[in-house]
Regions:
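Phosphate/oxyanion-binding loops and surfaces in catalytic or ligand/nucleic-acid-binding neighborhoods
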Residues: 63-71, 97, 131-138, 161-166
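Hydrophobic alpha-helical connector segments
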Residues: 30, 43-71, 125-128, 152
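C-terminal peripheral helix-coil segments that are non-catalytic and often amphipathic
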Residues: 104-108, 112, 142-181
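Secondary-structure edge/capping motif, primarily at the C-terminal ends of alpha-helices
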Residues: 46, 75-79, 135, 139-142
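Helix-turn-helix
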Residues: 1-26, 30
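Short, basic, alpha-helical segments at the C-terminal edge of helix-turn-helix-like DNA-binding modules
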Residues: 32-40
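Amphipathic alpha-helical packing segments from all-alpha helical-bundle domains
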Residues: 86-114, 122-137
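Amphipathic alpha-helical segments used for helix-helix packing
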Residues: 67-88, 103-104, 172, 176
């Protein structure tokens, strides 16, 4: 899509857009920065309102999948396919500015005995990110032809179960039984 096609419905000229943005990628970068900043704020608020880190982490990944494959899935598909490095740079910049919410949740889960105490939060975050990236940015799971939610249940959800103590597993089972009903 050209910049002209982007701005025409808004009644803007391309000259106006180029006054503020060097090119289409710069415009997309600024839009992504606003978008992911808003998502980060929502997640921070979501995390603060939760007393159970295991459930909060599960909800986070389920919401992310809904976003990537929901009403705007074509946008995210194209973004993941054509601009993965741009998307990564924006996400990394935003998460460097904000506290590492996921790391804090994992540490809280360890303290509250939801997660096993020998775990390393930094490694857990990396693995979850790799699993999520393999679901959203590769063709690895397309040939299976299952919904993204089912794929998530068989990857990240299973990984989270492996991190849990008996207490954490009880909470997860209660949570899953409540959302399946």
């Amino acid at each position: 899509m050209t910049v002209q096609k982007l701005v025409e419905p808004q009644g803007l000229s391309t000259k106006t857009v180029y006054k503020y943005f060097t090119d289409k990628e710069d415009l997309l970068k600024q839009c992504l920065f606003i978008h992911y900043s808003e998502l980060s704020q929502k997640f921070n608020a979501f995390e603060k309102g939760s007393s159970n880190p295991v459930i909060t982490i599960c909800k986070f990944w389920h919401e992310a999948i809904k976003l990537d494959f929901g009403a705007t899935h074509i946008f995210y598909h194209d973004l993941n396919y054509y601009y993965p490095k741009l998307q990564d740079s924006v996400i990394n910049k935003i998460f460097r500015r904000n506290p590492l919410v996921l790391k804090n949740l994992i540490e809280k889960g360890i303290r509250l005995k939801y997660f096993r105490n020998e775990l390393e939060p930094v490694i857990i975050i990396e693995v979850m990110g790799l699993l999520y990236t393999s679901i959203t940015r590769t063709d690895k799971f397309k040939k299976i032809r299952l919904s993204p939610a089912i794929i998530l249940q068989n990857t990240i959800d299973l990984y989270i179960r492996g991190l849990c103590t008996e207490k954490g597993l009880r909470e997860l089972n209660l949570y899953y039984s409540s959302i399946i009903k």
